[in-house]
Amino acid sequence: MKRSIRLLCFLYVLCCTVFVVAQPYAIQHLGVENGLSNNFVLSMAQDKRGCIWVATEVGLNRFDGNGFTVYKQHNSEIAGDALNTLLYDEKEDVLWMGGKFGGLCAWEGKSGCFRTYQARNGMKLENIVHLAKANDGGIWITPHHYDPIYFDSRSHRFTSLSDMGIQLDCRSNLCAFADGDLLYVGHYRGGMSIIDLKKKTTRRMLHDPSVPQSLPGHSVYSLYKDRLGHLWVGTEWGLGLLDSSTGRFTVFRHVPGRISSLVADRVYDICETADGKLWIACDVGGISILDLSQITFKHPEEVCFENLLSAVTGKGLSSSNIRKVLQDSYGNIWIGNYSCGLDFISHRPPVFQICGDRPVYGMYRGEEGQLWVGGENELLLYKNDSLAKRFDICCDMLCSYGWVAAIIDDGQGFLLLGLSDNGILRTELRTGKTERVPMGIRDVRVMTFFRDTDEKIWIGTVLGLYSYTKGIVRKETELNSKLEEKSVYGILRDRQGKLWVGTYGWGLKVFDDNNRVVAELNPDTGFPDGTVNSLFEDSQGGVWIATRAGLGYVPDTRYPERYSFYGYDHGLEDVFIRAVQEDVNGEIWISTNNGISHWDKKEQKFDNYDYRDGIPMGNFIEGSACRGVDGTLYFGSLKGICHFNPQELDTSYRVTPVQIMECRAMDGRTGKGDRLILPEENGNIELPYDRNSFRITFSVPDYAQNKRIEYAYKIEGLEDNWVNIGEESQMVLRNIPPGTYIFRVKARLRNGDWDESHVAAVPFCIHPPLWRTWYAYTFYGLLLLCGLYFWMCTYKRKLAARIALAAEEKRIRDEQELNNERLRFYTNVTHELRTPLTLILGPLEDLTGH
């Protein structure tokens, strides 16, 4: 009873919802042209790394914020290409998937590998159409033609309903939802079954055309329980809200001709977003959004939905065949289409908006928020950023083609339109009637207007200066005689009363009240550029000079020669300055060829914005800029009006932490499918010396930031400096020498600071070849020691032998010398003895002879 009362109260407020047409969503499309394997999307899931997984009829896709990685049977171990459903288990980091194949397939996040589980004992596990979480952490598997099966993800055991003692009357299933002891099963052409797993009872709910509060249709495609505890049921004939105590449904259907009713009756998916809104995916219709927080009572049929339609029937979705809606952890909305891929809605609407898609030249802010815009052969009036009126000025032009280069209010109820090669037209604001203003020359090109303090309007043309007073145009002959270059692009009067005139090729001249030249800024006087595109006076009285070589600034107009000049060195990505404008906080914004830039006074540098921030890619126009009453800035370009409110730019917006997505070896043997490198148990990547080239992919998974991200990396152990690689989200490391390194990468939003607190890192080691390993060097050392030992031993033996030989030789020499000495002694003794004997024998012989 209490549950019924709560439901009635809920319906009381729900049915009183006031339909409000919200601002259109900025929707981006992703399809096969972006790398998606197939445009027929059936299911989506997000893993804890922030990656979006997309199941299609041909392949599984992982989107990492930059691009898709496709998994098919030919390049992975996935069980099949034709997928139906996905379910991610964050605790175990496993993505479960079912499809038109046998078994339950899983992708394991820790290993990056696929694994397929098959049922035993004849249990049928084919064509799985839905996977749902069980209350105990298991999974309820819904095959299309067989009873739901419970899968214990820890023990990997399958249990059928018949094993539990439960029988179902209908075996053609579409979805299931577990709520405590109850299991809700949606059937195809068979209504819905409510199974009490504890009591082992089954209750069948069918569509009865004679009972308005019965199940809305015969086939139940989706089941969802919101945060308030209400069960929503999507069928082929509408959306039902179940009162479980009575078994009755409150039914919501499409009412032809009523734009705030459910967009279509066939409901394939229901998703509740963080802001308490139900996003209802309808086939052949689009998406209906129901805000449950803003409600009063009338009648259930008067409940109002906000509807998103396809691009064919309105503005928005790329297809009306919606199968799945997912809100990721960042708050973005992902929409799966059955024919056109994915639609993406960012959680942060773009600050920079574009009105129209045709060239915009002159621009002027009128009264009551009016914005007058000059186009090609036309004058446009915008109110609240929407086109309110269009004036065709072809009949009053002197030639068949021209554009409105400048616009100004003459203060007499007319708008002056300065045309290209067509002089000046005057449009009456009250009637819209247009007439030509005589200038004394037929086809002069008007470039700019400036209203002086005395209501005199100065006119800059390619033939010099003119002035407009009370409907009469006069050529300023005296001033023109002092202009070397007659093409006047900028005019203003400073606070001292001096007239500043910027020309196309001769820089800037400053005149006093007596039309005397008091200052000149041109290349001859040292000014960097002589081509002035426009002039602007800020709220402090300073003058900004837009040139083709940068931005000049004269802070004190009493001293025109004292100026600063800003270019590439100050952070500008493009120095061709088109127009200058100031916001309500006194900040300076400029348009260039490539985009829009903001001058940061504190940092003395420019912040740059371009097409990646939503700015048109076409060139901006000289002097085409103005500020709205609410502070919105408008810049004219060749691709429409770019407008934004600088106060909506959140400079505190932080970049999502960068993630290392994968590493792949570049061994050249597998072509595009390079081998996936899996980290070891210690988290390190280990590679041999002959596979020392590999690719590291990293990304910021939040796609809302994708186009605004810049990366920097360094490799500790190889280099110590951070290298800014811009938008590049992968690094190819080639021929890394053996060693231990750490690859680090950090990210930032463009114009922001680096996120030093979330630096992603992956350690890797390049193992040396066998002959360069430590044990090889140990062996080399031992071998060297052994060689040294043997050498020393040999040397010692040689030295000993040499010493012994020397000793022997010395002994022999000594003996020889001793013998020689003895011989000499004996010889000497003999000689000494012989001499006296000879002396004795001689006389004796003489005596004997005689």
Q: What is the role of each PLM region?
A:
Residues 1-768, 772-793, 838-845:
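Carboxylate-rich, polar loop motifs that coordinate divalent cations or form catalytic acidic clusters
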Residues 52, 231, 817-818, 850:
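Histidine kinase transmitter module recognition
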Residues 789-805:
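Juxtamembrane interface at the cytosolic side of transmembrane helices
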Residues 804-849:
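Primarily the dimerization/phosphotransfer
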